[in-house]
Amino acid sequence: MEKDSKVIEKEGNKGFTKSIISTVKNIKLGYGMDIYQMSTPASLIAPYSSLTYISDSFSKNFEILIKANSIENDLDRLLEIFKYITTIFIINNNACGKPIVPIVGETQRFKFSNKDEDGNEFNDSFHCAEHVQNSPFPLSVSSTVNEKEGIELCYNYAAKILFMATYFRINIDEAETFIKFNKFNETYNIILPTLYTRIFRGFSEYSGKLKIEPTKSNYYIDANFQSKPLIGGKYNYFEAYVSKKDTDEKIYKIFGQWDKEQQILDFENYQTDFFFKRPQQFYEKQLPNEILPTDSSVVWKGLIDAHNCGNNKLKLKEKTKVDEDQKLIENQRKKENINFKPKFFIKNKETDKWELDKFNKY
């Protein structure tokens, strides 16, 4: 007889919790310790690089941003951008697994297309991500663009995973995220909520503040992503307010679950209506003709194959092999006094931010 999916989930959560407790004892984790680059038991390593997590998050519903680019009204465009942001949060059955820490110079690069639920196609989009440094802190950068529409989403993520006794805190709230719309000469600066892995409850959730603030228009959004209580409450619930910058007057309240249905309350007439429901994903990657040796799929192929075979011993061996090779490369650079130069990103001297090298992206 097949086991019920909830039973399987509970058993998986027990195994995860047991592995975490064992790890805490073995390496004597201290409160607030950053474990991002720390060695992890093979059973806790997710079979994908954090670059894959970033790439899928921002690309899979990019058609919503393309639709936003056709909206002339500032307020309506902001609402459409908020819809997109609620789709970037990953629903993952292995949400408690730790993504692989990328090596310096690891890349992901592909064109992609999206479809909406009406079957309309949105083509000519491109995503590029690269892990540009490990010292003084690990930093991954990505750019998701559609040149035809004049849209670019940039993401600079200085990774940390902090051990907080009963949970891990993943600091995506400290990432620098912004979306540019050339058509409107407008940039939207975004603060994302924090990602938490609840050790003894066996799941991950986003909690804390989300903010979307444009540089020009007079509207902004403040949202609070709420943690699931031990008893009652809802998973993935948030409440957001759309306000005017000049007066802080609240115009709308948006509330619901980011993975389900959301409602909007108009403060002018106190009428509540349907706002948004996370759409199905119609997302197709088109890989380059030449897959670089630095691509995540190449760098971690051995580990991914071992995971798919259920061989944790081989999985750890493959992880160790890549890490040791990387140390040799780093030591050689130090010996020869060579500074690593990213392949696809350059640092803007004026803003001190990493940006996609427009002349070297393909």
Swiss-Prot record:
Disulfide bridge positions per record: none
GO CC aspect terms: cytosol; membrane
Superkingdom of origin organism: Eukaryota
One Gene Ontology MF term: sterol binding
Pfam families in alphabetical order: Oxysterol_BP
UniProt family annotation: Belongs to the OSBP family.
Name of protein: Oxysterol-binding protein 5
Native source organism of the sequence: Dictyostelium discoideum (Social amoeba)
